[in-house]
């Protein structure tokens, strides 16, 4: 069974620096097996930096697009996943934002999938969404009370099967964004709205293995997502560098 870790990086060279830290932790701590590849969706400009970096290896495949030059388009680039010409070779997919570090073996993560749904970290509530991070104000609006479960999720870590249901969901989200531009927090509100609408979300299982924080992490969970908003990189990158060096100094502790 071939598995894919999917990462996108566009627009800002500092996100290539984050990518470097993420990929290094995948190698050192994630212990990804030989059947797991890393697909990096990026530009020709960043392709040069990646291919000449210390972390570049035969595990990495590059998917190139030179049309994304804004924060908004860079965030939405992940919706192109199923346009990758070799995507059908992979059975399971783990999408990761670049502002992530891995501090434990993550091979087991792929085995958590039980249904053809997106598995994501639970965050927020569509009925209490004053900043509209999850589409509560712009997309759900009067539909909120249609949902007994009003919990939302963070789209920075998403795990799913390579299946018709998810491929179709990505298509639906793309079309929704073209027709309705009311949501301002990039594509995350559209992920939340449509995944809930079509009952294609599990936002509980990954909570045991993913930590979302905007401070120095204090957890032994496998995946650390340093939050802070799209395009806001300075604090995130600083935390990632400091914590990565901490991990290197405490390798035996972190890998337990």
Residue locations for each model-derived region?
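GT-A fold catalytic core of metal-dependent nucleotide-sugar glycosyltransferases
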Residues: 76-132
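Conserved catalytic core of nucleotide-sugar-dependent glycosyltransferases
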Residues: 111-176
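Short loop/helix-cap segments at secondary-structure boundaries that form the rim of catalytic
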Residues: 48-55, 111-112, 216-218
């Amino acid at each position: 069974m071939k598995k894919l870790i999917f990462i996108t990086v566009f627009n800002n060279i500092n996100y290539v620096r984050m990518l470097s830290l993420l990929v290094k932790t995948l190698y050192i701590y994630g212990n990804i097996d030989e059947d797991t590849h890393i697909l990096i969706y990026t530009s020709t400009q960043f392709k040069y930096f990646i291919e000449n970096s210390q972390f570049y290896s035969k595990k990495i495949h590059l998917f190139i697009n030179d049309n994304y030059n804004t924060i908004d388009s860079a965030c939405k680039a992940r919706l192109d996943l199923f346009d990758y010409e070799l995507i059908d070779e992979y059975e399971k997919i783990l999408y990761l934002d670049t502002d992530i570090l891995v501090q434990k073996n993550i091979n087991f993560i792929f085995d958590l999938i039980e249904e053809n749904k997106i598995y994501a970290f639970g965050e927020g509530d569509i009925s209490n969404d004053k900043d509209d991070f999850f589409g509560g104000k712009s997309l759900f609006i009067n539909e909120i009370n249609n949902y007994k479960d009003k919990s939302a999720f963070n789209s920075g870590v998403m795990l799913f099967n390579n299946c018709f249901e998810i491929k179709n969901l990505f298509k639906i989200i793309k079309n929704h964004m073209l027709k309705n531009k009311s949501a301002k927090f990039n594509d995350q509100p559209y992920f939340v709205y449509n995944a809930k609408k079509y009952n294609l979300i599990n936002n509980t299982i990954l909570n045991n293995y993913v930590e979302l924080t905007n401070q120095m992490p204090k957890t032994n969970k496998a995946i650390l997502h340093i939050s802070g908003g799209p395009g806001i990189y300075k604090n995130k990158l600083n935390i990632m560098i400091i914590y990565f060096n901490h991990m290197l100094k405490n390798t035996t502790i972190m890998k337990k």
